[in-house]
Structure formats: structure tokens, C-alpha cells
């Protein structure tokens, strides 16, 4: 059995809970306060008693108004209570006593009609009630007596008899309240449809708990003059509304201001009122205004997403259309909503498997790796420190290290295909194809001044050696010769010790090596080095014994020396071909060319001319008028004008091709050396030359290579060992010879830079501040002036303007044509920077035979010079019985009474020692001098 609390009954009565409880206690009910509960029977009795008392007199009107103002009645909407406006007391007094007389047939008929009615079908019943309420509100100020007489006469005309006290059929109009309906036994909880949630507030609305609902409009009502009799409430009918899904509760709204007693205007009850239920408070507006306001105040959370998106946005200035800011800017004045119904918020679960992959190319920076894994860079750095790697956020790590770090965070590393890898794939795709025969590439190697270039001159019938400074080759040269025996490409390499790298590159790009050995000189150092390079490259060697026309030529000695180096001649049972030549006398040149063709036939040299070009840089330089220029040896494919290529860290487009004679070429096939213009920079000699599909790919690859080179420099090991620490501490004592180096071509520059760096010793170091190809510029002068360096130019000369600037800045600029002259001057400059050394030389001995004491001077020893001579201001040692007592300087030297500059052997003299007076007879004075000796470069 359900129980009802007192404050719920107080709400039905429109009084405060405390006042209502006090009144019940005075009447003898056993309750303690407004929170006490009573059963349904007691609640019905309290309703009858209290309502009858309240209607009978006017003494409770003021208390009722106060209670209504303090506790406004609420209406249950969708499972929650919403405050309703309070009707002024005067209106309540006139309306609450209305009684309705309805025949039983009409009541039964209404019940039958109302049973199947749903929430949406209740509008016709509401429209029938509207005139009655409107009439009541309109005529509230009319006198009561005339109204009663008029209504009685109308009722009598319609029905002959009206009972004053109805106790059976219709005892009193049905009083329906939210609280009583909820607590009725067996009565289901009535919930309105969602579209009735918003309650219209009006200061002149009629209290829904005090107005009776007539069954039809043809029955007139009359105000009651007497209080109700205690008769029980009879339920005429109940409308079963569909139970709606319970929505999240919204905060209760409170009225913005208290109600004011003023004349109410005609109002229309809410169209959502159900039959037999309490009426909704009427809004003080016309039906048209009411409809528009209902549409405007429709619950937003009841709208569908499509309706909510189509709802008009906040109004701005007239004619202004927001096109760039979106709804966040336009709706900034609105109150934020509690949540978006249609927003699909993903739970904080793990990422999808497809998102747990990180693409890494060859390297990746720590910051990029952390960003792709969505973790802090400091955490990744901590992981790297745990692996023993000290890395910064901008430092790169390789793919293996990135894989270890990513695995700890649950990621998989996928290796991306870089442009560099794309070039490799492109090169592999070009492999195969139809190959045709090509001419051999022959490199001429040997010791300096053994006649390499002279042999080439004899073959080409040119005179290159005379044009070389000092008669030696200082550039790597490539020539294509068309001979009677066949076409041959020759690569001429320097023979000087400084050009080891050039000889190594020449051996790598060649098919056959011609080793030139002078018959009068034999095997030398660079000869042995050339043999090592050739054997390392697995290239066959043809020996040309040159200068056989000289008187002291010894061919057999050369063969013996070479046989010791695994180059046995064929006539001795070996596999090496020998040719005896004389370049100046044109002896043996044809036999040498035939040997070259024979070796080429044995190698079966072939290449595919239709594939993408692959070549090698033999030489590169920065030309003043043409920019970067490189000598390329095409190894495969056919190079044409307009081809895009990558060479080392640079890229470009073939804009012009020249042969070794300076003639323009349209294309160049395999084994053809050409000079290419159109590079973005000067490449290093030995770099690979690759033709790519387009300019975009070429630039991307060159940029990636440049970045990798820079990262390699920055990523050098920064760990300092104890030995390195001592080396750095001692570097302050090591002197430096700073050099700014300029050369005409890249290969010579590299060779000269390496040779200069090899001159460094423990005492003095050669430091190259800057090196580059091309002429000496103003920036070189300023750099040398700021760093106290010298400038060395190899095959380049400064202009008059640069010379004037060098004189102004006091910078030493030197130019050379022969490389070993430059190296000798650098060595002399290093020696000049060293501190000189001194050697001691004993010049004479003197024996003390007497002692004289001279005032203000001290003790003077009378000595006899036994050997050599004694010089003034020379050093002296005082020896007593072979033990050195003192080492100092001779203070005075006299012969008799005159000062002497020196005293020779066999003469007597007086010698005074500075700051030493303990001279005794028998001591030996040993005179010596310190001679300066020039310093030498150690190891």
C-alpha cells in the first residue's frame, strides 16, 4: 500500500508544507511534520476536509496566496516536475467553485470516447473546453448575483431539475493533480509526449489544480455558494498515454519574477492537454503568436540532427554573411549545450592496427619519430639514452634504431622507398637489353717524368706535355682516339706522389692499364703504386718500356724489377705483354696500339647504348664563364642534350657537351669522354653520373644526398675519451698554418689539399680554412685577413682588384704552376713558424791561480787560459774537482788593468763571475756560448 507525504498534499492545496502540517496537527492528525507519510485513505480524507475548509471561507485566502507564492504548483512532464505560474487569488476564488452537471449517459459516452485516445488525439477535447475557460476569465469582474441568476435561468430552460448536492453521478468536478495521479493505486504514471516538454509561462494563467473540466460546451456552469460536502473523489475517466522513453533530466527552471495581480487577457489552453487531465497554463498571446512561440521554444534536444542543422543561426548584422568563421564564431553568444547528441565520440581505446605503422626512410629525426608515434620527444630521447645513444631532437637515427624505439611503443616500422632507392630500382630495371661492342678505356699510369703524356702525344700526334707546367701532368685528361687498329679512349693520370686519388680513380674506370716505365730510370715509387691500384681493380696491365733510345737504357733491368712485382713478360712464361717504345722517336707506338686492341678483344667489351646513362666523373671545375663543368666518361647508355641527371650531391640538365678538342656533340655513347655543362654545383671527382626521368626526381635525390652528408657531419661521434681530452688540451700548444687554397680543377684541388694536410706534424699543423675551384676572390682575401692565413693558388691568378685588396689587408697571396713547388714553400713556412733551437759550444778553459778582492766589485780570480779563448759576456761554469758549483755569466774580463774583449790561450787574465764570489785557487772556469740552430719538421 502506497503512502503519501504531507508536503505533497500541501502542494495540492497550494500551501506551504509547514503551514499545512500545523493545520493537520491542530485537527488531530497523528503526524510530526511535513515529511511524515499517510496512507491513501487518510490522504483522501485530508483532501476532502482541507479542500472543503479552504473553499468555505475567505480567512485562508491570504495564507493561500503566500503559500502559492512560496511553493508554486508543478506539472509532471516526461517524468520530471516543472514549476507553473501561480494564478492570482481573485481568479482562483471565482473559478474554483464551479460545478458541472453531466448526465450519466454523457459521462459514459465520454469515457468510451477517451479510452483509445492517444496524446496526439487530445486536441478536439481541448478545443471544446476553451470557450468555457475563456468565458470564465473574461467575466471574472462581473457581479456574482446577476451571473448566478442568469446561469440558473439558462440551466432551468435546458433541464427542469438541478440537484444542489450531487453525491452519486457527479458529486464534484474531477480534481486532477500531478501528485494525486502519481500516487493512485494501480494508476500508471502519465507522461506527456516529448513535444510537450516546454511549458508556457504566463502571469495570468489559470491554476491547473483548481479548474474543473466540463464534459461538453452545452452545459453551463455556475459558481458555488457553499463549500463542498465531504463526499469522495470519483474518477470519471483516464486516458492511457503512450509511455515515452525517459530522457536525461534538465535543470528545473525558476520564474524570472514573481506573479503580479493584474487583469488577465483571454488565453487559449495548450493544445497538448489530454482528455480528463489537468489543463496546461495558458499563454497570454493570440493563437498565431502562440504557435510561433511554440515553434520557437521547441526543445532542441528533441530535434533530429537534420532539424538542428537546418535551424537558423544566431542573427548578426543585416546583410552580413559569415563565410569564413563557421558556427563557433556565430554562436558565441549562446549558452553552451550540455552535449551533442549526434557527435560520435570514440572511446579512449587503442588505435586501429592500420594506424600502428610508422614509415621511415633511410634516417629519421628524433622529433619526427616522436611526432608520428604521438609521444613526447623527451621520452624518445630517454629511450635512446637507455640504448647508449646521446641524441638531440633534431638529430637523425637510422632505421634499425628507429625500429627498436618504435617497437617499445607498439609500432611497426615500414621502410619507405626513397628517391635514392628509386634510382637503384631504375638502374636495375635498365639492366640487360641488347649489348653491342664498345671501344676500350685505357689508362696510362707510371712514375713522374717517365713519358706517359709523351706516348699519348705520339698516339694522338699532339703536343700536350709541352703545355703542362714543368713538363708533368697535373690534371686527369681523357681523349678519344681513332686509330687504324681501332678506336681507343685514353685516360691520362698524373704521376706525382700527390695524385694518388687520381690514379686510383683512373684504375677504377678503365679496362686496360698501360704502365709506362723509363728504361733509364727503372721501377720507382709511383710505378709500384700504379701496379697496386691496377691489381686492386683487377685490370690487365700492358708494360711500355719507354725511352729506349737513351744511352743508359736498360730494358732487361726493368723486366727483372717488374717480374719481382708479379709482372713477368710473356717471353719469360708470364702473362704480361711488354712493348719497347720511344715517344720522341716514334718507336713501338703501333705495336703498343695493337697490344691494346688484342687485350680488348680478349675482354669482349660490350655495353647497351639504349638504356639510361651511367657514367663517372673524371674531373670537375668551376669555369668563370660557363659555371660548373665536369668531364664525364659514359660507361653505358647514350647521353644526349636535355637529359636530367644526378651526380653526387648535385643535379642538372645537359645543356652542352664538348669533346676533348672543344667541339660540340649532340650525343655520346659508351666509352666516350665528354665535358658536360649545366650542373648545379661542382661535383667531386669519381662521383657517379646517372640520368633520371625528370627534373623533379633529380632535384629530390640531390637534396636528399646533401642532407645526408650534412647529417653525417653533425652526427659524428661526440664521445670524448681520456686520450682525446689530452689531445684537445695539448692543441693549444700546437701551432697552425692556416691556408686558403684555390685550384683550377676539382681533382687537382683534392690532391693538393691532401698533400698539404700530410705535411702536418706534432709541432705544427696545416689547416685548410677554405678550398675551392676557380680564381681567387675578394671573399678569400677577407677570410685570410680575419684568420691570419695565407692564400695559395694553383694554376689561378688574382685579378688587379684582388691584388690591391690583398696589399691593403697585408695578406700573402702566392700562385704556383708546379705542385711540388707549392708544397716546398708550405714546408718552409711551417719551419719558419717553429721556435729555433740552441746548441752549446765550449770555447775555452781557464785555471784560477790567485784571488783578488776588489771593493765594490767582489772577488776576482787571477786565471791562466789553458785552452781555447775566454770571451766577455760568454757563459761560464765554475768547476771544483770536476763538480759544477755554479753556472752563470762572465761579469768582467781584464788583462792587467785594461778591459779585454777576449783572451787567447797561454795568457793570464782576471775573470769576475756575476753573482758568485766563492772562487778558490785551483778552480777551473769553463767558458761556453749558445749557437742558434734552425728548427726542422719532425714526424
From Swiss-Prot:
Comp. bias intervals (Low complexity): 259-277
Superkingdom of origin: Bacteria
Keywords from the named record: Cytoplasm, GTP-binding, Initiation factor, Nucleotide-binding, Protein biosynthesis
GO molecular function terms listed in the Swiss-Prot or TrEMBL record: GTP binding; GTPase activity; translation initiation factor activity
SUPFAM superfamilies: Initiation factor IF2/eIF5b, domain 3, P-loop containing nucleoside triphosphate hydrolases, Translation proteins
Sequence segments annotated as region (G1): 446-453
Start and end residues of each stretch annotated as G3: 492-495
Gene3D superfamilies: 1.10.10.2480, P-loop containing nucleotide triphosphate hydrolases (3.40.50.300), Translation factors (2.40.30.10), Translation initiation factor IF- 2, domain 3 (3.40.50.10050)
Biased composition regions of type Basic and acidic residues, renumbered to the chain: 181-210, 300-312
Subcellular location, record wording: Cytoplasm
Region (G4): 546-549
Keyword Glycoprotein assigned: no
Entry-linked InterPro entries: EF-G-like_DII, EFTu-like_2, IF2_II, IF2_N, P-loop_NTPase, Small_GTP-bd, T_Tr_GTP-bd_dom, TF_IF2_bacterial-like
Main location: cytoplasm
Region (Disordered): 51-81, 137-353
Region annotation G5: where it falls in the sequence: 582-584
Region annotated G2, chain positions: 471-475
Residues holding GTP: 446-453, 492-496, 546-549
One cellular component (GO) term of this entry: cytosol
Entries under PANTHER family matching the protein: TR-TYPE G DOMAIN-CONTAINING PROTEIN (PTHR43381:SF5), TRANSLATION INITIATION FACTOR IF-2-RELATED (PTHR43381)
Function: One of the essential components for the initiation of protein synthesis. Protects formylmethionyl-tRNA from spontaneous hydrolysis and promotes its binding to the 30S ribosomal subunits. Also involved in the hydrolysis of GTP during the formation of the 70S ribosomal complex.
Annotated family: Belongs to the TRAFAC class translation factor GTPase superfamily. Classic translation factor GTPase family. IF-2 subfamily.
Protein name: Translation initiation factor IF-2
